[in-house]
């Protein structure tokens, strides 16, 4: 079939504070890490040997996924870091450099490899992508999606000849300057020989360094225009929007956990909710061991994680409460992501608990 490579060593700075204590692939959607959906998708398509490069907060990825047997796959990890004055510090080697490190260590990439970023949700037909890659005799392929011209400035744009051979790239061009509307999705198919072009023991990037080499040497390097759901979580605003879509049921293969107690309202085990004294309008998920007090209002799409406490008269509108978040009496949160330590609005503006610059108050339900 093929092997898999999940790129998971980045710091995730654009989605802070969500990644303050988590690697980006561990950011949750419906209570599951982003990367879990990727592994499940790879397994469904028969890709069972998967390497993951890790750096920041790497233990959280490794402890959660282990050897991959829970998903019917084999997972391996390649840590990227340095020893600095007695401390081991994360130091990513770049997307291509990280793959070359694995190849130098074991020669793992001995057949076609599907390369994925660990921070996106996809439903790509992997079998069809592999077939096209192989039928063209490609050394490397980039999976692309057609995007509206007025959105090209948000993407890396791929410029091809008529038969799909890649001629050049444009990084986030203005609409009037864009030579195509084919956006790179960060999904690649590589033959082992591609990694021979990557220098050993150097920081090296796939998009900005490896791909220009392939173009300059006129190697068999193709774009595939495919039609599939690709949900990239590059910013906090993307994360909020994705959760809204998922809760509304607009994303395939994303099943709401818990028991549906009334249309559009799902609850976990051991919840304390006086249904005749609260207002809850779905779609809403309320996690296990959560308490909702009389007079509280929750308007969906909303996700209330496990162990939360929404106090009397509080209002939560189109928001996400991470686990163990407490919302005080009569406090109002609208289109926010709230954890016990911080809250962030849909545009990424962040407040930390205890700051005096806002009227908003919240806390840790365990305290």
Q: Over which residues does each language-model region extend?
A:
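Long terminal segments
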Residues: 341-367
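Phosphate- and divalent-cation-binding pockets in alpha/beta enzyme and binding domains
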Residues: 14, 60-63, 101, 125, ...
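Conserved beta-loop-beta/alpha segment of the NTase-like Rossmann-fold superfamily
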Residues: 62, 70-161
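Catalytic-core segments of class I nucleotidyltransferases/pyrophosphorylases
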Residues: 112-114, 121, 127-134, 147-150, ...
């Amino acid at each position: 079939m093929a092997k898999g490579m999940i790129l998971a060593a980045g710091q995730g700075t654009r989605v802070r504070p969500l990644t303050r204590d988590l690697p980006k692939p561990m950011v949750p959607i419906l209570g599951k890490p982003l990367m879990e959906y990727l592994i499940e998708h790879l397994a469904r398509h028969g890709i069972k040997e998967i390497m993951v490069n890790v750096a920041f907060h790497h233990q959280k990825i490794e402890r959660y996924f282990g050897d991959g047997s829970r998903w019917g796959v084999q997972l391996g990890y390649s840590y990227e870091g340095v020893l600095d004055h007695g401390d081991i510090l994360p130091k990513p080697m770049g997307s291509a450099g990280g793959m070359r490190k694995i190849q130098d260590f074991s020669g793992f990439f001995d057949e076609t490899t599907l390369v994925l970023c660990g921070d996106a949700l996809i439903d790509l037909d992997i079998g069809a992508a592999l077939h096209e890659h192989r039928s063209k005799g490609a050394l490397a392929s980039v999976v692309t999606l057609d995007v509206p011209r007025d959105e090209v400035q948000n993407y890396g744009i791929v410029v091809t000849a008529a038969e799909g051979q890649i001629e050049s790239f444009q990084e986030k061009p203005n609409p009037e300057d864009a030579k195509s509307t084919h956006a790179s999705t960060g999904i690649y198919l590589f033959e082992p020989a591609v990694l021979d072009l990557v220098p050993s023991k150097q920081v090296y990037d796939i998009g900005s360094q490896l791909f220009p080499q392939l173009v300059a040497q006129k190697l068999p390097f193709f774009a595939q225009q495919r039609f599939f759901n690709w949900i990239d979580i590059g910013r906090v605003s993307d994360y909020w929007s994705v959760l809204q879509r998922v809760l509304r049921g607009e994303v395939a293969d994303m099943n709401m956990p818990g028991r549906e107690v009334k249309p559009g309202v799902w609850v976990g085990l051991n919840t304390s909710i006086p249904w005749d004294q609260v207002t809850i309008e779905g779609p809403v998920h309320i996690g296990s061991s959560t308490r909702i007090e009389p007079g509280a209002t929750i308007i969906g799409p909303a996700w209330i994680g496990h162990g939360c406490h929404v106090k009397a008269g509080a209002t939560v509108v189109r928001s996400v409460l991470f686990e163990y978040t407490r919302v005080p009496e009569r406090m109002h949160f609208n289109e926010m992501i709230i954890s016990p330590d911080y809250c962030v609005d849909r545009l990424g503006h962040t407040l930390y608990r205890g700051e005096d610059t806002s009227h908003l108050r919240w806390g840790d339900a365990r305290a």
